């Protein structure tokens, strides 16, 4: 293999675990499981919504310490899959399917600056008019942004069962 012929050590395989496209998650997970199994290394599942936050966290030097991050994936109509995290990526609110209205995120907007990002954030721009609302454009889950999340999971020993792990679809 390329990795073996170039003496590149492989200690684990990381994969985006969802939510997201059913087909995309299945293909990605099948590939990751195959590589992890063939190389006899552990599998790391990285939540897609956390993955979306990495770019803004790495490149926005002006983001205040008390900022909250709301990564979003467009579901359909006015629905998004979203979670709320603090800057350390601690979960403030678990992943859920939200109908976007002017009040959907008011609880957090009234407390701190809230950064909306991901392909679902465009829906919020049209309906949320709050001084703490910040919209980060053109943010997508990128493989290169998976590295810091996967490294943290690796160091903490957070691996998933290679045989039985399933993607998180949120909705079947």
Predicted regions and their residues:
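Stable alpha-helical structural segments in soluble proteins, enriched in small hydrophobic residues
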Residues: 2-6, 38, 56, 146-154
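Catalytic-loop motifs flanking and including active-site residues across diverse enzymes
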Residues: 27-31, 101, 142-146
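Surface "functional belts" at beta-alpha junctions
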Residues: 42-141, 169
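N-terminal beta-alpha supersecondary unit
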Residues: 1-19
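Short glycine-aspartate micro-motif
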Residues: 12-16, 24, 68-72
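Acyltransferase
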Residues: 134-172
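DPxDG-like acidic metal-binding loop motif
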Residues: 16-48
């Amino acid at each position: 293999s390329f990795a073996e012929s170039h003496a590149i050590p492989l200690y684990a395989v990381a994969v985006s675990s969802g939510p997201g496209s059913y087909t995309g998650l299945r293909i990605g997970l099948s590939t990751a499981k195959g590589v992890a199994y063939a190389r006899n290394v552990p599998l790391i599942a990285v939540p897609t919504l956390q993955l979306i936050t990495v770019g803004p966290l790495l490149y926005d030097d002006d983001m205040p310490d008390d900022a909250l991050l709301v990564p979003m994936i467009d579901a359909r109509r006015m629905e998004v899959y979203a979670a709320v995290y603090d800057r350390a990526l601690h979960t403030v609110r678990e992943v859920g399917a939200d109908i976007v209205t002017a009040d959907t995120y008011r609880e957090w907007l009234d407390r701190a600056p809230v950064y909306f990002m991901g392909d679902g954030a465009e829906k919020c721009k049209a309906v949320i008019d709050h001084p703490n609302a910040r919209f980060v454009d053109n943010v997508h889950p990128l493989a290169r942004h998976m590295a810091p999340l996967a490294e943290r999971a690796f160091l903490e020993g957070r691996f998933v069962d290679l045989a039985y792990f399933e993607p998180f679809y949120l909705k079947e």
